[in-house]
Amino acid sequence: MTGNQMFCRENELDESFKQLASYINIPVGVLLPFKSQCFVRHYNKGQIVYYSSDETTHIYLLLKGNIMRENFNLNGDVYRYLNREKVLFPLNNLFQDKVPNEMCTALTDCEMIGIPRDLIEYLCKNHEEIFVKLFSLLSETQCQHIEYNMALTSKLAKERVTKILRYLCQTVGYDHDEFYEIKHFMTIQLLSDMAGISRETTSHIINELKEEKILFKNSKNWLVSKDL
């Protein structure tokens, strides 16, 4: 690696550290002594971040891009959770040995900083403000998961798709006054997989929402009216 490359990597890590410190509301100086234990990585679209959350020793802050986290239970059911930049994951790995089985995939090109799990646990024990922030983030994540799981209990297909779209607007959508924008990674097939209904049925429902002027396509992005 050349001197210029090393300088760029160092600057990249410094900038990522600032974003991490800002995200968990602490001075960047608290984190700097641990910089050598962390890394910044780029993942290409479709690349696996980790195959199983019980194998990863790090917690990640997603700096750019979108990811999908798939949780598998003992019955073989799959729950898919999507995230966009500025999310810390997997938080349910903290302070416990047995963790849910989860796989993480980059839906778009991504950039993230990895922090050792035991370092996060150490910082939580020694800095109350970090513990409070992470507890708040974990509670918010749990509420989002409950909302998604409740959407899956809807018996009517259109109601289920509509509720999942509302959930996606809150978790991966960008607020634009009267509508939310969901980036181009969203597809009929992915929405169908998340809803647990056929692609054909999902496509029919999406066409209905377009006719009702609730959902629009802008290039490859989805625009969802707040009247949904």
Swiss-Prot record:
GO CC, one annotated term: cytoplasm
Top-level taxonomic group: Bacteria
Keywords: Activator, cAMP, cAMP-binding, Cytoplasm, DNA-binding, Nucleotide-binding, Transcription, Transcription regulation
Pfam families (alphabetical): cNMP_binding (PF00027), HTH_Crp_2 (PF13545)
Binding site for a nucleoside 3',5'-cyclic phosphate: 22-141
Residue intervals of the HTH crp-type domain: 155-228
Molecular function as annotated in GO: cAMP binding; DNA binding
A Gene Ontology biological process term: regulation of DNA-templated transcription
DNA-binding stretch(es), residue numbering of this chain: 188-207
SUPFAM superfamilies in UniProt: cAMP-binding domain-like (SSF51206), Winged helix' DNA-binding domain (SSF46785)
Keyword Transcription regulation: yes
Localization per record: Cytoplasm
InterPro entries tied to this protein: cNMP-bd_dom, cNMP-bd_dom_sf, HTH_CRP, RmlC-like_jellyroll, WH-like_DNA-bd_sf, WH_DNA-bd_sf
Entry function: Positively regulates the expression of the arcABDCR operon under anaerobic conditions, thus playing an essential role in arginine catabolism. May also control the expression of genes encoding proteins which are involved in anaerobic metabolism. Can bind cyclic AMP.
Protein name (Swiss-Prot/TrEMBL): HTH-type transcriptional regulator ArcR
Species, as recorded: Staphylococcus epidermidis (strain ATCC 35984 / DSM 28319 / BCRC 17069 / CCUG 31568 / BM 3577 / RP62A)
Gene giving rise to this polypeptide: arcR
